[in-house]
UniProtKB/Swiss-Prot annotation:
One of its GO terms (cellular component) is fungal-type cell wall. The gene is POH3. This is Class I hydrophobin POH3. The keyword Glycoprotein applies. Belongs to the fungal hydrophobin family. Aerial growth, conidiation, and dispersal of filamentous fungi in the environment rely upon a capability of their secreting small amphipathic proteins called hydrophobins (HPBs) with low sequence identity. Class I can self-assemble into an outermost layer of rodlet bundles on aerial cell surfaces, conferring cellular hydrophobicity that supports fungal growth, development and dispersal; whereas Class II form highly ordered films at water-air interfaces through intermolecular interactions but contribute nothing to the rodlet structure. Glycans are attached at N110. It is found in: Secreted; Secreted, Cell wall. It comes from Pleurotus ostreatus (Oyster mushroom).
């Protein structure tokens, strides 16, 4: 009698284990609530001489900037729709964009697009 109980227990336990839900951890969505997501080929400090030279050639006065400066950027509108991809640095920028050549007030966002 006990052998049947033990046999049924060992038969049912794997089925219960297989039916147990597996918790999924989805990566957090990128947070860029204060600006816009940009895909920049390069992200530099505002004090970098290359940034100052490029800004000077374009006639842009940078002034005091918080964050970093994105160079050669394009906006990312909707993630996952229409083949949006960024093979460079994804940043969240809350400053001015000068035709995508220079975008000020950027901070890196760790997402994979």
């Amino acid at each position: 009698m006990f052998s049947r109980v033990i046999f049924c227990t060992f038969l049912i336990l794997p089925l219960l284990a297989a039916a147990t839900a597996i918790p999924r951890t989805n990566p957090p969505a990128p947070t860029c609530t204060t600006g816009s997501l940009q895909c920049c080929n390069s992200v530099q400090a505002a004090s970098n001489p290359v940034v100052g030279l490029l800004a000077g050639l374009l006639g842009i006065v940078l002034g005091p900037i918080t964050g970093q400066v994105g160079l050669t950027c394009s906006p990312i509108t909707v993630i996952g729709v229409g083949g949006t991809s960024c093979s460079a640095q994804t940043v969240c920028c809350n400053g001015n964009s000068f035709n995508g050549l220079i975008v000020v007030g950027c901070s890196p966002v760790n997402i994979s697009l």
